[in-house]
């Protein structure tokens, strides 16, 4: 495999239900994502967009096919090993920021680093650098409720990359923001991806933002296709 390929899906199948109620969402889906690449996933609700992200992020097991991350096949691994890969290699950003309300912005970004075994000092330094990079270093001591929507989402992005993953999966990361704020947040996300060499798959309904990414894909009849 090309060493620059971070994520590769080969013939991925995903079903829900059984018997007469069996619903096939992904039907032999193929997709690859390279280091430093930002790809937009633009698809109507109900076509399998979130399912694709969940399978790619090792949150769900595919019913067929193969998921490979940085050259390592993830199918057949124990849940413990899948969790370890997820924590080490993958960052997630969602439409709702899911920040812990009782902790400051800085502490929210520190949390995954502390869980990963970094010292308090190391986590604090890294979190501060990320806040500065996202241009909200002055807001580090504020709790989520004291931040604007755009600031909250930038904290969520910083938290997602706190452990220096190689793959970023984002599900409608600007969906709750007004167009101007959405553009500003995407600018910050794009700069972070380019600077760090992350591979990013971003699900969005925002066609303007999708047009600024390297490629656009959709899901048609259970397969991933470019458009």
From Swiss-Prot:
- Organism, by scientific name, is Rhizobium etli (strain ATCC 51251 / DSM 11541 / JCM 21823 / NBRC 15573 / CFN 42)
Q: Matching SMART domains, A to Z?
A: AAA
The record's principal subcellular location, in a coarse class, is membrane
- Stretches assigned to the ABC transporter domain: 7-227
Q: Which SUPFAM superfamilies match?
A: P-loop containing nucleoside triphosphate hydrolases (SSF52540)
Q: Write out the similarity annotation.
A: Belongs to the ABC transporter superfamily. Lipoprotein translocase (TC 3.A.1.125) family.
Assembly information from the UniProt record: The complex is composed of two ATP-binding proteins (LolD) and two transmembrane proteins (LolC and LolE).
Q: Function of this protein?
A: Part of the ABC transporter complex LolCDE involved in the translocation of mature outer membrane-directed lipoproteins, from the inner membrane to the periplasmic chaperone, LolA. Responsible for the formation of the LolA-lipoprotein complex in an ATP-dependent manner.
Top-level taxon of the source organism: Bacteria
Q: Which molecular function GO terms apply here?
A: ATP binding; ATP hydrolysis activity; transmembrane transporter activity
Protein name as annotated: Lipoprotein-releasing system ATP-binding protein LolD
* Membrane topology recorded in Swiss-Prot or TrEMBL: Peripheral membrane protein
Q: What is its subcellular localisation?
A: Cell inner membrane
Organism placement in taxonomy? Bacteria, Pseudomonadati, Pseudomonadota, Alphaproteobacteria, Hyphomicrobiales
Q: Which positions in this protein are listed as binding ATP?
A: 43-50
E.C. number(s) listed in UniProt = 7.6.2.-
**How is this protein annotated for GO cellular component?**
plasma membrane
Cite the entry's keywords alphabetically: ATP-binding, Cell inner membrane, Cell membrane, Membrane, Nucleotide-binding, Translocase, Transport
The processes (GO biological process) annotated in the record are:
lipoprotein localization to outer membrane; protein localization to outer membrane
């Amino acid at each position: 495999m090309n060493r620059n390929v971070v994520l590769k899906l080969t013939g991925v199948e995903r079903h829900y239900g059984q018997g007469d109620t069996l619903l096939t969402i992904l039907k032999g889906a193929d997709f690859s994502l390279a280091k430093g690449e930002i790809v937009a996933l633009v698809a109507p609700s109900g076509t399998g967009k979130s399912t694709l992200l969940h399978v790619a992020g090792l949150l769900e097991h595919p019913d067929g096919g193969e998921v490979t991350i940085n050259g390592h096949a993830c199918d057949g691994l124990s849940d413990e090993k899948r969790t370890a890969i997820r924590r080490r290699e993958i960052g997630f950003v969602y439409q709702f920021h899911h920040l812990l309300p009782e902790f400051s912005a800085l502490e929210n970004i520190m949390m995954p680093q502390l869980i990963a075994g970094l010292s308090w000092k190391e986590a604090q330094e890294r979190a501060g650098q990320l806040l500065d990079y996202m241009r909200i270093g002055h807001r580090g001591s504020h709790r989520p409720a004291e931040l604007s929507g755009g600031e909250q989402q930038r904290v969520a992005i910083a938290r997602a990359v706190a452990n220096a993953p190689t793959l970023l999966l984002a599900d409608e990361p600007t969906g709750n923001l007004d167009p101007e704020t959405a553009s500003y947040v995407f600018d910050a996300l794009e700069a972070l991806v380019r600077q760090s060499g992350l591979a990013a798959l971003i699900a969005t309904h925002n066609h303007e933002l999708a047009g600024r990414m390297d490629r656009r894909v959709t899901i048609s009849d259970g397969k991933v296709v470019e458009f």
